[in-house]
Amino acid sequence: MTNIRKTHPLMKIINDAFIDLPTPSNISSWWNFGSLLGLCLIMQILTGLFLAMHYTPDTTTAFSSITHICRDVNYGWIIRYLHANGASMFFICLYAHMGRGLYYGSYAFQETWNIGVILLFTVMATAFVGYVLPWGQMSFWGATVITNLLSAIPYIGNTLVEWIWGGFSVDKATLTRFFAFHFILPFIILALAIVHLLFLHETGSNNPTGIPSNMDKIPFHPYYTIKDILGALLLILTLLMLTLFAPDLLGDPDNYTPANPLSTPAHIKPEWYFLFAYAILRSIPNKLGGVLALLLSILILAFIPMLHTSKQRSMMFRPFSQFLFWVLVADLLTLTWIGGQPVEHPYVIVGQFASILYFLLILVLMPTASLIENKLMKW
């Protein structure tokens, strides 16, 4: 008799995706991040659900409701900090997952890659609206500054901003709709993640060499389920260490002050995972130019498959491209650091150089290095 997991309509889907899935035998730990992202998403949805049971999306009570969660709700403090630091872990996994895709040429699976770019935008939107909910100083001013960027759009800008605000400033209507967005978006992310997997399973996974591995596949279970469990344990350990020993390490102290429209914080800055984009935005002295650069800094990922000029898929055997890839990583870390610094002399010019280098690397230097490597292969 055939096993039920291979015949039952629902079990068959799970079986084909997580049990009998043919997987390359040589994929490294860099391929763990996909499952870790799934784990992060589930944890965020669950902790978020329990937080939503006690949170009130109203300007007068939002801040107090967070205090109430931390002080009066059973284990409310740990749920709140797991959710806040879970977002940081989510972005760490997300950036590692994208870095892996860039390094090993996974973007050659265009449908999977494009859904991934849409997923990135959706996760960033979710994190942004979520940061507004505690209604602290940085929540309020972050929302004001970022939504105000839309006013740079010619002709419709101001109308658009007021439409998003639901009034003439960030207020009660804004908070209520941001809570609604923050609740619905994770489920949209979940649906997109399933589509992402669907497209991936059409082609099968890439591997470190970038060479087709159809002649050397192994079942996902038990080999990669065990490997993924190890990654999951490390992720949970890191998250618990962060949550229990340094819950506010990645947060902003300004957000412990209730929102006050009459007092602007000295340095308005987003959470650490947006600082690189914020630095690119600030490096251009023109409002519209800055907004376009900000948008392009993420949207450029969609053009990566078109910028691939190498005859090899992976960077595994391409030393020049490898060097430029790590320069790009260093550049992004520099931008992240600059984004958290005040707008004054040494930081401004360093941020401008780093921003130029970011676009130069992706649009010019890396495609050129690939062409040089193609020539060297003929020697």
Curated annotation (Swiss-Prot):
SUPFAM superfamilies: a domain/subunit of cytochrome bc1 complex (Ubiquinol-cytochrome c reductase) (SSF81648), Transmembrane di-heme cytochromes (SSF81342). It is a multi-pass membrane protein. A ubiquinone binds at residue 201. PROSITE patterns: CYTB_CTER, CYTB_NTER. Heme b b562 binds at residues 83, 182. It comes from the Eukaryota. The keyword Mitochondrion applies. Heme b b566 binds at residues 97, 196. Signal peptide: none annotated. It holds the Pfam family Cytochrome_B. Its main location: mitochondrion. Keywords: Electron transport, Heme, Iron, Membrane, Metal-binding, Mitochondrion, Mitochondrion inner membrane, Respiratory chain, Transmembrane, Transmembrane helix, Transport, Ubiquinone. Its cofactor is heme b. GO terms for biological process: mitochondrial electron transport, ubiquinol to cytochrome c. The keyword Cell division does not apply. One of its GO terms (cellular component) is mitochondrial inner membrane. Belongs to the cytochrome b family. Component of the ubiquinol-cytochrome c reductase complex (complex III or cytochrome b-c1 complex) that is part of the mitochondrial respiratory chain. The b-c1 complex mediates electron transfer from ubiquinol to cytochrome c. Contributes to the generation of a proton gradient across the mitochondrial membrane that is then used for ATP synthesis. This is Cytochrome b.
